[in-house]
Amino acid sequence: MGTEIYGSIEFRHPGVGTDYYEGEPWVAAMDLWPLYDQSDYAAFGLLFGVRNYAGFQPLAAGRGLPNDLSGAVRAQLESSVARGDMDGATWVTWAQLAGLDPAFLPGRYVGRVSWSQPESGLSHGQLVPARWPDDVLATTGPPPPGWDPAHGPLDWTADNGLRCRYEPMRTDVLLGPGTGWPHVFAVMKALADRFGDDAVRLVVAFD
């Protein structure tokens, strides 16, 4: 069974510390779903250190749930995390996400190669270093001429008919168009434009 992500976007209420505001400091703005509904372990590893097979230095791993969690997100996550039904609980601010280097690559692997049979659509994949392992080369053949491990994605058809795809493990690919993360980031940025980069955060846990 695969690992899935759950969570919500919160913002810090601008009235905290004033005489007129008596509510909780952090307010739930929007659930992670329907903005993000995928299970990309490379992205999970990059951001949160979960299923980090690529060996990223994660941005925000193992922080736990914030002590000042909003009531709505507390009801969503706290009991499941406490029972052990979810783990990897952590949080990250928009300021930290906005500071990610889009061209960053992990040290061990530079990309991932996937392949599928046209008739079945069933896909297989493997993380690869700059020099592809022999078993990958035997399946997909060599990468096309002019291949650059830092660029892509790249699609080709192998001599055996397999449809192949290479994706670099760059931040802008793992979190870019088609991944679902741009929707999350768009909401967080809109909130940050109003409340400040450090006053918007994403709180998550995994099952």
Model features per residue range: what roles?
Residues M1-D197, D207:
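Acidic (Asp/Glu-rich) sequence patches and key acidic residues
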Residues A199-L202:
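Conserved GNAT acetyl-CoA-binding A-motif
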